[in-house]
Design a protein with these regions (language model features):
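A short tyrosine-centered beta-strand micro-motif
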Residues: 117-124
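Short consensus segments that form the blades of beta-propeller domains
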Residues: 90, 131-135
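Extracytoplasmic
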Residues: 63, 95-97, 114-116, 137-139
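N-terminal secretory signal peptides that target proteins for export/translocation
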Residues: 1-6
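Primarily secretory-pathway and cell-envelope proteins
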Residues: 26-88, 144-227
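N-terminal post-signal-peptidase region of extra-cytosolic proteins
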Residues: 82-89, 96-105
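Bacterial N-terminal signal peptides
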Residues: 10-21
Length: 227
């Protein structure tokens, strides 16, 4: 039936194919370099550390989704972690790595609601315990914290970071945003790519960790199957 349809009505078949392609494309996430000013609600101490170049992420239909500012020269760990499931072991737990502004209400990697607004991002690792088993194959995360209560650029101990991050959700759990390996990054950065197996979108961009440029992959849409 489909073969007869395409044989006798090639123009209609082509139009349908283009329609499906356009529909799929309209659901894409896209990333581009921008120069949106760092939000004023971030403290001057942290604002001074952030790059003036940002990454703009557009959601389905091209609507504004979020803006990301990474820290210029993120301090590298003196002894990088090589623990199982850690892909970004040169990052230091509790360190300020950047800031993010969401234009719309979003869901984090645990499917928790996060309101539109500006947040700091600190690096953390998923604890190895029964409460987090099966959440992700990868232990690297950015945790959101409220900028009006997180004004110092000092490293935070895990518990202090978790306490602050809990204030960005209504569930009593920190807001976690998964970092994935950069091997699926598009050729041109910044860029976004979909993981169809796990049904999430990640944005990939360069960040300077110590003296080395590092490609990071941050999941910005989609959540763990086992939150």
């Amino acid at each position: 039936m489909i073969r007869r349809f395409t044989h006798f009505f090639p123009a209609v078949a082509l139009a349908l194919a283009l329609s499906f392609a356009t529909s799929a494309s309209a659901q894409d996430y896209k990333a581009a370099t921008s120069a949106v000013p760092v939000p004023p609600e971030i403290s001057s101490a942290i604002r001074a550390l952030l790059s003036p170049a940002s990454t703009s992420v557009a959601g389905p239909g091209g609507s504004p989704y979020c803006e990301i500012w990474m820290r210029t020269g993120i301090p590298a760990a003196a002894q990088p972690s090589s623990a199982l499931g850690v892909n970004y072991g040169t990052l230091v737990e509790g360190e300020v790595v950047g800031a993010i502004h969401f234009d719309v209400a979003v869901k984090d990697f645990r499917n928790q609601s996060v309101k539109p607004g500006t947040y700091l991002m600190r690096y953390g690792q998923q604890p190895v315990d029964g409460n987090h088993q099966g959440v992700s194959d990868y232990r690297d995360f950015f945790l959101l914290t409220p900028p009006d209560q997180d004004a110092s650029a000092d490293i935070l101990a895990d518990n202090a970071m978790y306490v602050l991050s809990r204030k960005t959700t209504t569930t009593g759990h920190p807001s976690v945003w998964s970092l994935v390996p950069a091997d699926s990054a598009p050729a041109s950065l910044p860029g976004a790519a979909q993981n169809t197996d796990e049904n999430f979108w990640a944005v990939y961009f360069k960040a300077a960790v110590g003296s080395s440029p590092t490609t990071l992959g941050l999941v910005i849409f989609g959540h763990a199957a086992t939150p």
